[in-house]
Regions:
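Conserved catalytic-core segment of nucleotide-activated headgroup transferases in glycan assembly
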Residues: 230-234, 238, 362-408
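Acidic donor-binding loop of glycosyltransferase active sites
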Residues: 436-447
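C-terminal alpha-helical cap of glycosyltransferases
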Residues: 118, 201, 519-533
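A short, well-ordered alpha-helix in the C-terminal region of glycosyltransferases
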Residues: 505-520
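Conserved core of the sugar-phosphate nucleotidyltransferase
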Residues: 82, 86, 104-194
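Short phosphate-binding loop-to-helix
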Residues: 53-98, 106-114, 271-281, 294-295, ...
Length: 533
């Protein structure tokens, strides 16, 4: 069977100058349709109809033939039917003629072949690419606007509504004339939304470029009571920054899926590194993010061998594996010992909801205290603080105590809600709202400390473990009162008393120190570096 593909590509595009030869994702626009036609298992010959010397060079270099288009067929009023008919070699007998537009770069060759096969099997005269796009639409009839529907329904319940995409028209050669390519027996072949891009505007160009450069993203993250769950929160924030839905992996031996909370992201448990590596070999991700604390060089070498073309980004990693990473972000540390390491608070990823809250106003007196030690609190600081604040001497102050998803003995701590000036909450979704209702904070040296600083809340901080002792930002020099790892109760309570009675002027000074750091721009900095790899 002889099947001819014709790609019309004139030079005179006015809306987007030089449209057909513009570079998109490393190739001229017309490259994609020529490539599909040449790779097709069913198309036997490929001809490009053009009046562009540049298009002819591209086509011939790729191995396609060219039909130089006469000037009389290059005007805006000339129909595509006449152009296609002119390009057909009349000295050969053809079974099908496939019109392929150069403005559909996202079409897949598998879809093209499936449509040709569908046309042949169903003995169609013409088959047109289309997308099913049901909408509540209207038409004009006798000068009035009338609905194209009988009943208003949600989109998924509306009848099919096919829109031509322009990607291809498969026609029996016998029906193609200078006036038409449409025979009597016509059908449409549905293509995916991603393959339906038809470049007519600069906005379409941007969509096509993004679609052709689609990333395959994976995130490997673990969190529990021992290591904390700030990694989980950060992974979910990063996942929202990509224009694809990442696969989020976690080790089922280390992480309870409940710590992810309510999310529609794709969560995939793995039973150890061996299973993760096997999946990576099959998936071949283009971007792989580790948020698992310290990595070994063996782990990183193994990962790179599975996904050799991927860019690997590590967060909060101070292990030897960092030398094999393409990027390392350590917002909690200050050491930038290698060029790929970006350390310090300017790479902190602020939660989206915090961006909508202004720093608190420092009041004359402290009346309300925020207490939270992250998602896990392995030192049980929450328990110790609750025992302190129920003393009669603190009855005139209000305390908000927030417990995280990985905290143990939550039910016992919720019993403290019986005290009128104490509010104990578990796994809240309105953290910035709660924080901004308070005058001071008491926290550890992880994510919550950064959140309090973002809102300009003077805070006391203590470390949960030896690793947190190395965290650089939550310190006295930046406006916190850091009192060490596992300080004695008398130190904690003494510092709290100092803050409760602290003057407005001193608290304002601490707030100024906290707000001197740009914690809100870290998300942008991180993603710019990732996207520019």
């Amino acid at each position: 069977m002889k099947i001819l593909a014709i790609i019309p590509a004139r030079a005179g595009s006015k809306g987007i100058p030089n449209k057909n030869i513009r570079i998109i994702n490393g190739h001229p626009l017309i490259y994609y349709s020529i490539k599909n036609a040449l790779k097709s298992e069913l198309i036997t010959d490929v001809i490009i109809s053009t009046d562009s010397p540049e298009v002819r060079i591209i086509a011939e270099q790729m191995g396609a033939k060219c039909k130089w288009r006469d000037e009389s067929l290059c005007g805006d009023a000339v129909t595509l039917d006449a152009v296609i008919y002119d390009a057909i070699p009349k000295d050969e007998k053809w079974d099908y003629v496939v019109t392929m537009q150069p403005t559909s770069p996202t079409l897949k060759v598998e879809t093209l072949d499936a449509a040709i096969k569908y046309s042949i099997e169903n003995n169609l005269d013409t088959c047109i690419s289309a997308i099913n796009a049901p909408h509540l639409s209207w038409r004009e009839e006798n000068g009035q606007k009338v609905p194209n529907y009988e009943k208003r329904l949600n989109r998924q319940f509306l009848p099919a509504n096919y829109l031509e995409t322009g990607a291809f028209v498969v026609s029996k050669a016998s029906v193609v004339t200078a006036e038409t390519r449409i025979g009597k027996k016509v059908d449409v072949y549905e293509v995916s939304e991603q393959e339906a891009v038809d470049i007519d505007t600069f906005a379409d160009l941007r969509v096509a470029a993004m679609s052709l450069n689609t990333q395959k993203v994976a995130i490997y993250v673990n969190g529990n009571n021992k290591r904390g769950i700030g990694h989980i929160y950060r992974a979910l924030e990063i996942a929202d920054e990509f224009y694809v839905k990442p696969d989020i992996y976690y080790d089922s031996n280390q992480t309870d899926p409940k710590v992810f909370g309510k999310t529609t992201h794709i969560l995939k448990p793995v039973d150890g590194i061996a299973e993760l590596f096997q999946i990576c070999k099959e998936k071949q991700y283009t971007v792989f993010i580790n948020d698992i604390l310290t990595t070994s060089i063996d782990y990183m070498i193994g990962l790179k061998s599975c996904i050799p073309n991927a860019k690997i980004i590590n967060f909060e990693d101070d292990g030897e594996g960092i030398i094999k990473a393409d990027l390392v972000f350590n917002a909690l540390f200050e050491d930038e010992q290698f060029p790929q390491i970006h350390a310090g608070e300017k790479y902190y990823i602020c939660g989206k909801t915090f961006m909508f809250y202004e720093p608190i106003t420092i009041k004359e007196k402290v009346t309300k205290v925020f207490i939270s030690f992250g998602g896990a609190d392995p030192q049980n600081y929450s328990d110790r603080l609750l025992e302190m604040i129920i003393k009669p001497e603190y009855k005139d102050y209000q305390f908000v105590v927030v417990l995280g998803r990985a905290k143990y003995n939550v039910d016992a701590l919720l019993e403290y809600n019986k005290y009128p000036n104490v509010e104990v909450l578990y796994d809240v979704s309105n953290m910035p709202e709660l924080m901004t209702s308070c005058d001071i904070g008491i926290t550890s040296r992880g994510r919550t400390g950064y959140e309090l600083a973002t809102l300009g809340i003077p805070s006391i901080a203590m470390a949960q473990n030896h690793r947190e002792e190395k965290h650089g930002f939550v310190c006295n020099e930046n406006g916190f009162s850091y009192i060490g790892l596992n300080p004695a109760d008398e130190v904690i309570e003494g510092t709290m008393k100092m803050y409760l009675s602290m003057s407005q002027k001193t608290r304002q000074h601490y707030q100024d120190m906290l707000l001197s750091h740009d914690l809100r721009g870290g998300r942008r900095r991180v993603m710019n570096l990732i996207n520019n790899l």
